[in-house]
């Protein structure tokens, strides 16, 4: 067992069967192989064990176990695009879009220049899987590239939203918590590789090497709820 992932081998009659399952509430992707064989990626969904392999044991032979290697990551493959709620309440012009020349080359990523401390809202419901908000500085030096504050949230389809450049202490959620679409999750800042206060968002899927890659996003505005005025 490895965290929320379990890989087991069981004897069923004359067959040795390899099973994989996840205890997490969201999809995970497992890349596994027998020693010397090519890795095979498999998406595991909650509550649905998957048979990875089986072999018939020769009569009179010992119960030969599979020799297996595997790695895994939260998320799913095959997601083509995302349609999600806008992460900011007030309409504003995008400062840099997908494949932007400044820092979005080869990426579907989206930036909005907003004052530090602007509330960030969850683009879709999901589980918080990573949080970093201890960094304090920002700038354009190469050392800044790994010093951005961020929140990562995985959705029910296995896509993962990344909210980046939060202010110091700007995360209002913690790892393991479930958030709903539109819920405040943090506050914008200017940490990491940044030329000024802004919010950077992207949504990723996993490829067959279980490496994240960004996907196109369509944003919609949440409707404003009218309130009765006495």
Model-inferred region functions:
Residues 1-13:
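Low-complexity, acidic Ser/Thr/Pro/Gly-rich terminal tails and inter-domain linkers that flank the onset
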Residues 82-86, 95, 141, 147, ...:
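Acidic, glycine-rich catalytic/binding loops that coordinate metals and/or anionic ligands
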Residues 115, 158-182:
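Short histidine-centered loop motifs in beta-beta connectors
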Residues 135-143, 188-200:
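Active-site loop architecture of trypsin-fold serine endopeptidases
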């Amino acid at each position: 067992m490895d965290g929320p992932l379990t890989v087991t081998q069981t004897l069923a009659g004359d067959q040795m069967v390899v099973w994989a399952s996840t205890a997490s509430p969201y999809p995970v992707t497992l890349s596994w192989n027998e020693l010397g064989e090519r890795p095979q990626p498999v998406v595991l969904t909650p509550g649905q064990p998957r048979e990875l392999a089986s072999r018939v044991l020769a009569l009179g032979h010992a119960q030969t176990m599979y020799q297996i290697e595997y790695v895994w990551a939260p998320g799913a493959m095959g997601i083509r695009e995302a349609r999600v709620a806008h992460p900011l309440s007030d309409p504003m012009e995008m400062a840099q879009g997908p494949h932007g020349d400044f820092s979005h080359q080869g990426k579907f990523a989206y930036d909005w220049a907003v004052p530090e401390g602007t509330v960030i809202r969850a683009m879709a419901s999901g589980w918080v899987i990573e949080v970093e908000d201890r960094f304090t500085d920002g700038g354009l030096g190469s050392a800044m590239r790994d010093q951005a504050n961020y929140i990562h949230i995985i959705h029910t389809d296995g896509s993962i939203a990344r909210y980046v450049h939060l202010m110091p202490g700007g995360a209002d959620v913690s790892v393991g918590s479930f958030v709903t679409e539109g819920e405040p999750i943090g506050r914008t800042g200017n940490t990491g590789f940044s030329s000024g206060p802004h919010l950077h968002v992207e949504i990723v899927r996993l490829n067959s090497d279980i490496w994240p890659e960004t996907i196109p996003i369509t944003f919609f505005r949440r409707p404003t709820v009218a309130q009765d005025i006495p």
